[in-house]
């Protein structure tokens, strides 16, 4: 009954917080409690529970450690076990369940339960009961049910049981206990929770110390109705609110329940909550079952300390008093180890409640951890979309409650992950993004999304796809994109003028008066025109198929063909977010969208037609709106046609520095123009399709154009400039591979290639700046090593090098050697005269070994020298990383060698030192006997001594072992310091003392560079007696090991001295005291409150020495000239025996020649006459014969000495191993260099070779086949130990070698430019003549044709002239290219071979015959081709021999075009013999109509020049009256034509196959070249031109479009006029019969 009554008590008494009255609340009935519990049941995520259940089944193992789930991973295959499918109608396995989990198909745990039940029932139905599968199914099903019940039905029953336990045990400790005793118990329980850690040392209670922020976690307070934390519990303990342990247990239960309700099962917080609850009840049981008889002081100290940790320093200070209690000290030390783990709770208590914290949240900014998310609110509104998108990514958690974005908070460590910064060129982290948000650097959400995507792409690029980081990236990208769409939809709702939802919105808002708003309003109007367009009759919206891009799943090929997809959604989004800098940007995107539709879909399809109609409507509407008021560019139609349209919409205002550089490179190549203003990049913008040029894709395996490069650039696929340059170089290489060396496109590719490299060089600056300066690095390493050794100190702070300063500079055993001391070495180091580590080591060891030779083994100098040598070796190995950084011969001398040398040296010196000590002791003994004899004689005279241990003088007692001041011999000296060893009184009653005298530093002989401890004195070898009356006072001398830690009582600091060494006046040397043997003093020593710092001061002679240095400055100035040269290591000639050597030759491995040391394996520059750069030779043999030195070895050549394509790129300073191996005299050597393999070039350098003389070689050049092939490496040599090896420095990070263009590139460009300049020069002469007489003759007027002709503007390719003018032929012959084709010889060969092939294959078409003729020409021998070329020499240039009668139209493509109004060429008079009636080629006037072709991709118009045949004997009229003999004069006055055509430019053949393509268009059954019947049937309204076709129209023929609407209309009008004039000529000159 009592138990039930306790359960009926309201729980509000422990959770409401109202405990001040000290009474229990009124009880409430039981049902209300149950209703409250039901309302607060945990809201568990079913998907998380399903994952936990699946993982439990998957990870369960039996007693043998086998996974039981392996039997059910996959269902049996129907082929192997067909009977399984007879028994089981619905097969399922764990793989299917896992797939459903990934697809989140389980919305409820019951669905997963049904699948698992089906899985195990299938197994039980098929397998026998004694089979392993059947037993495993039973076990796993039982495990599944138990686990499911724990997750789903965990809430009420467990809490009820816990409450019963707590209530039953409530009275065990509370009854009869005082409030103070209960408080101590509660504090112990709280302490157990607060200090509990997991095995890794993490505090379990960390997340439970404070409630989560209401700002950052508002949903927590919506779910949790009774929030509580450890801070609240600590306050209630301090306030005495808990009347029993059960009351605190209720709050702990509530704390755990809240955590498990809000967090997912399996999360870390969920587990920590269970741990806290378990710890509490374990501690509670421990207290209940043990007698509470421990020391109250210990309990109080421990428990109050825990409470003080939680509640701040203001509570229970008395319990932590200053008394030295061991128990208190124990707990204080225990807490000191824990540090400040509970500082967060203490801070929370000091600064008030949670609401106060939220109010002050704007001032709190934390850089790391969870607090970082809160700091965003201090500078940004929570409703800000930027903050929402950032916070969504940053605070996203997985099912275990872990922050998914945690690895992205900061960038990886450069020390731990150096390769990350090699692969990732633009690293970025959430912290950097947060900083940009804080500084408001993001203009739009797209900019923020761009940075987040960059961060994710970096992670995906660095990590493997199966890694955990990679999976986190995918999840975060999904979350980010979903949030971005949500924010976009929210903008749609907030934006009242959404263009898609309300397409008919008012376009004339009077509120938007600014220029920006007017521009945006115009874009909306144009957008709405496309949006509202409908098909007449059906009412179908034409834009429906353009709203969103096609699905990648349904149309995968679309994204292979269309590199830059675009849809109306994107355009609308860009308009709304002001991404377009102007109206042109939106128009470019619209045109791109329509162009994509026409490119992907077939002509005549619905989408194709809709794109054309919508584009026309858009242009018409834009024309209707007119130009912007302040847009001056719209005034001139000519300017509008010629200028670049708009700013690229993809070029955002916000670009990273790398994106800006990439854009600059791209724009530099794209916008480059030649001297005539022609843009060279036009033909490289887009490749022809496979249907247009199939053979291109057969020849070129990796096609590339500038549109693809631009799309890669906009998609952030280029991590650095080199990646983009590689694609550009590939594109130019493709152009040079496919096209002829004489073609214009070949020349344009070379020029743009040069522009590309120049632009990259300008952007990146000095390309070699990233190569480390090895000389400086070696000197820095030597400097660091020297400073480390010279500043090496012992435990007392004494520098070991101080004692070595007294070493003489010259070794007495070798007086002829140059002097060498540490001071000289220091000057060499400061002057950077060491280039080798082994030389520096030799000098250092020479000084140290001299110190060892000249001093005893037990002396301080000897020991310091050994210590410094050991320290040198250790620091040297650390700096060189045992050869990983610097590989030097110096590393061969190790500590083991040093120990052997020292031991050997000691064995030699110790016998001598023992003999010296013996002699010294005998001498001291004799001196002592003499002194005793003298004192004995004095004693016989009547003096008698009475010895004592102490004596008094002037009211002071002096004891043996005391230190005293003794009156100095001279008045101006300091008192002497003496240690009393004996005291006596003579017979006269006078008191005496005898002892050891201590010297101050100024009383010793030492170098001015020596430093001393403050208050240091030295124990001397001088002992003497002094009358006690000479004592001036007491002092204390302490040993160095005690001086800094202890201090004497009742002594002033100035009377306390420190002694570290003894001083010998005979040898004037110092030696450290190892054992303090002075008499025991009666002075008492106590520990110092603060240990004294070890401070060393300079000698008193240092100032005087400075004066001497100043006097010697003049002498040092004289020696400065010596500092300019480098110190060289001593070397010697190393002869070697050569078994197969020639007689009279003396061979060497190392030889000195002209002050240059050379060894086998070295590379040298050798004199090379007639070359730009000297060649490089490698020494493989060295010999001297008759006093002259020679070497033999292979020769390396430079790229300009090889044959290669001009577009080939080489590494800077790259050379090639040739087939040449020569013997050269040493006199031809210009200097040393180093040729490294590719691997070594990236990673290391020899230290004595300048960087400019370091060369790279990875390929061998074969002269016979002109091929470059990589080889393994150069031959290595094994030399004797006398040969000095090179020191090699290895870079910490491999360098990236830069490439440079071929040296032939510039020469080839200059040659082609000169050739084309000569061709264009001929045109200029004709143009000048044409300008003088530009009038043309008007033919008789005839009625205009009513039926317009359709020209084939987009079908007929341009075939430029084939013949080379005389002025250019000379240079063309010099250019020996294997791909050069002389088309005149080919024409002659074709005229002969065509008849032969025609006879063999009468059924072949004209195009097939032409292909066979071309194949035969390619396979023809060179000699035969030369014969045809010679045969063509007899014909006039440009005219093929005709084999038969000519009928119809004859192509004059091989002739030079002539400017209208200009005279005919001198080699073609108006009547050419053999070609009756053919007018001069190239005449373009109203009498001759050229056949218009497709303009070149470069933008220049081109056409196939044709003439019209007249009757035999009749000549065509000249273009203007002149002194030409042919033809009757024309009396009519010429009039100015309506359209004036500019002179056609001479252009080279772009592709050799273009000629064949033209021939294929001919037909044997037709009497004409063009399809004139189709041309006459074409009408303007029936022909729809695409944007590409319009761009290729020869619009520059006309000055302006005149009165016509578009330029196309004007050209249609020109076509009608030309057809009419053609008919007029035909009728006027009676050409009907031709």
From Swiss-Prot:
One of its GO terms (cellular component) is kinetochore. Residues 901-933 have a biased composition (Basic and acidic residues). GO terms for biological process: blastocyst formation; blood vessel remodeling; cardiac vascular smooth muscle cell development; chromatin remodeling; epicardium-derived cardiac endothelial cell differentiation; heart development; heart morphogenesis; negative regulation of cell population proliferation. The modification N6-acetyllysine is found at residue 414. There is a cross-link at residues 96, 154, 210, 425, 471, 511, 591, 638, 653, 1106, 1111, 1167, 1293, 1308, 1398, 1587, 1599, 1601 (Glycyl lysine isopeptide (Lys-Gly) (interchain with G-Cter in SUMO2)). There is a cross-link at residue 1293 (Glycyl lysine isopeptide (Lys-Gly) (interchain with G-Cter in SUMO1)). The modification Phosphoserine is found at residues 10, 39, 131, 178, 319, 353, 355, 371, 375, 498, 509, 636, 648, 689, 948, 987, 1405. Residues 41-151, 177-287, 381-487, 518-625, 653-763, 769-879 form the Bromo domain. It is found in: Nucleus. GO terms for molecular function: chromatin binding; DNA binding. Residues 956-1074, 1156-1272 form the BAH domain. Residues 1379-1447 bind DNA. Pfam families: BAH (PF01426), Bromodomain (PF00439), HMG_box (PF00505). SMART domains: BAH, BROMO, HMG. The keyword Coiled coil does not apply. The modification Phosphotyrosine is found at residues 134, 1289. Residues 157-167 have a biased composition (Acidic residues). Residues 1-39, 155-179, 487-517, 625-653, 901-942, 1106-1129, 1354-1378 are annotated as: Disordered. Residues 499-508 have a biased composition (Polar residues). Coiled coil: none annotated. The keyword Transferase does not apply. Component of the SWI/SNF-B (PBAF) chromatin remodeling complex, at least composed of SMARCA4/BRG1, SMARCB1/BAF47/SNF5, ACTL6A/BAF53A or ACTL6B/BAF53B, SMARCE1/BAF57, SMARCD1/BAF60A, SMARCD2/BAF60B, perhaps SMARCD3/BAF60C, SMARCC1/BAF155, SMARCC2/BAF170, PBRM1/BAF180, ARID2/BAF200 and actin. Interacts with PHF10/BAF45A. Interacts with acetylated 'Lys-14' of histone H3 (H3K14ac), and may also interact with other acetylated or methylated Lys residues on histone H3. Involved in transcriptional activation and repression of select genes by chromatin remodeling (alteration of DNA-nucleosome topology). Required for the stability of the SWI/SNF chromatin remodeling complex SWI/SNF-B (PBAF). Acts as a negative regulator of cell proliferation. This is Protein polybromo-1. It comes from Mus musculus (Mouse).
